[in-house]
Structures are given as structure tokens and as C-alpha cells.
């Protein structure tokens, strides 16, 4: 049985909508990042709707790592190497954990600046057109079964090519028949040689539609923006029982799409982040 917080269906009656929060009885937690026409946009520090996050007792990832999984032959630049978009994403991850854009979350439960890396795995087999959540989990497990490192402090980010879309239940990303979200993060249990691990992962489908693109952003910038959002949320609320507000919104949900995504440290794409310290959205830590 799933407990689902869904306000997306009531867009004609409400001035804004929220992230779709899905908590299952097996401990799996999923948070869908809405398209830009479905986001709340709290904006100004101390402004209307400035409702701080509360801590609900669950774990955070105090010293996180990032790992990119590029799924499909489309990530080939034609010479057998990763293309420019994938290469830029690795550059983004290699510096993200030390930026002010990341350090803003250190106010939550002792989270530290992260040693995010540019480690990756490239699976050149092509994914199906519709990549369900179970298929995405199977792809992460495929990496593990091929000798990949199993680590419960790593966020495994799976990048999909433009020939595929992501689906979770009846909701889809760009390219699917029921467009609702641009990306999401979740978790699952994996039995490794060193015991059961709580694996954190994110689905990063290709931002091929207007609802998941920001004016002036390149495709890589849009990916970076979503990776920023999903990585920080997977760190501050990995299992759905740590940091979120009374409506179920996690830190990045409260600043999704408004204020406007921006080009920040290193020229990469970022999202504003909720700060309890100022009761509003900020670009970086002070």
C-alpha cells in the first residue's frame, strides 16, 4: 500500500501545486519533481507561505558521494567516448559538493560539504522507450552485479537518452503520455556481501519538452539543474522521514522553478534552495 500526497490534480482550483510524495510500506520513498507549470515557488525569504522544514527523526547523508550512470548508446560522441553533455555532467558533479550551492544544506542535521566525484558507469545497451521505476532500479543493480561499488552514502544518478522517457505509476516525464514530472529521487534495499544496504538513486530523464526546460539553458544546464535538486534532496531526506515541511515538500521542492533557475558556480545550472535560517529560498550558503 502506498501513501501518496498528490495536489497536482487540483491545478484548476489552486494557485500552485506541490511535489508528489509517495511513501510505501516497504520503506521506499519517492519524490517527483514537477514540471515548471506545477511548482509552488515560495520565492522571497520571509514572504508569504514561508513555512520552514521540520526534522522528522530520519537519517540524512552527512558526507555524500555522487555516481553517474549513463544508459544508452546515445551518450557516445561518435568516437567511442562520452559526448559533451555527459562530460559536462561529470564536471558538474566533480565540483558540486564544495560549492556554496551545496553547502546551504549543511544547516540540516550536520550535513557536511561532500566529496562528490566524477565517477561514472556507461551502459551502452539502449533502454526501452518507457523506463519504469523497476527498470531503473534494475539498471542500478546491473551496475552492482558487474562489480560496481555498493554504497549507501552514494546517490546513483541515472541519465536517460532522448529516445526514452521515465515513468512512475501513471506519471511520466518528457516524451510520455502523462507528463507530470521532470525527475525524481527514491531508494531501495539491496542485499550485498556486506549486508543489506539502503540505496539512493535518482531518475534524470532527457529534458526534451518545454515543461522541463528553462529559457537560455542548454540541455546540459537543464540536466545540472535537476541533478542539483535531486542530489540535495536525496541527501536531506533520503528515506522520506528526515527534512520536509507539513505539506510534504522537501527542501528543493519549496524553491522549484521559482525563483528562476540560475547559472552559478562554474557556469553550471542550479536551483535555489530552501533555508530555514532565513525562511526562504537562497542561491548559496552565506
Regions found by a protein language model. Name each.
Residues 21-140:
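N-terminal carbohydrate-binding/catalytic regions of secreted carbohydrate-active enzymes
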Amino acid at each position: 500500500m502506498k501513501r501518496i500526497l498528490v495536489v497536482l490534480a487540483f491545478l484548476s482550483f489552486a494557485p500552485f501545486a506541490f511535489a508528489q510524495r509517495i511513501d510505501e510500506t516497504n520503506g521506499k520513498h519517492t519524490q517527483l519533481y514537477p514540471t515548471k507549470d506545477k511548482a509552488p515557488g515560495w520565492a522571497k525569504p520571509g514572504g508569504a507561505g514561508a513555512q520552514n522544514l521540520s526534522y522528522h527523526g530520519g537519517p540524512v547523508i552527512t558526507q555524500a558521494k555522487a555516481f553517474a550512470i549513463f544508459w544508452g548508446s546515445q551518450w557516445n560522441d561518435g568516437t567511442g567516448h562520452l559526448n559533451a553533455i555527459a562530460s559536462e555532467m561529470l564536471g558538474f558533479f566533480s565540483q558540486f559538493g564544495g560549492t556554496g550551492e551545496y553547502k546551504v544544506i549543511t544547516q540540516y542535521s550536520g550535513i557536511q560539504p561532500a566529496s562528490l566525484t566524477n565517477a561514472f558507469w556507461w551502459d551502452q545497451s539502449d533502454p526501452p522507450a518507457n523506463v519504469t521505476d523497476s527498470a531503473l532500479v534494475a539498471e542500478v543493480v546491473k551496475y552492482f552485479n558487474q562489480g560496481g561499488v555498493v554504497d549507501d552514502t552514494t546517490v546513483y544518478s541515472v541519465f536517460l537518452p532522448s529516445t526514452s522517457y521515465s515513468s512512475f505509476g501513471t506519471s511520466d516525464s518528457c516524451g510520455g503520455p502523462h507528463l507530470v514530472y521532470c525527475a525524481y529521487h527514491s531508494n531501495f534495499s539491496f542485499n550485498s556481501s556486506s549486508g543489506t544496504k539502503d540505496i539512493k538513486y535518482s531518475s534524470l530523464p532527457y529534458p526534451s519538452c518545454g515543461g522541463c526546460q528553462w529559457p537560455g539553458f542548454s540541455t546540459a544546464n537543464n540536466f545540472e539543474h535537476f541533478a542539483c535538486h535531486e542530489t540535495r534532496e536525496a541527501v536531506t531526506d533520503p528515506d522520506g522521514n528526515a527534512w520536509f515541511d507539513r505539506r510534504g515538500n522537501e527542501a528543493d521542492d519549496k524553491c522549484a522553478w521559482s525563483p528562476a533557475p540560475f547559472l552559478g558556480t562554474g557556469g553550471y545550472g542550479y536551483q535555489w534552495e530552501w533555508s530555514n535560517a532565513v525562511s526562504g529560498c537562497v542561491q548559496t550558503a552565506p
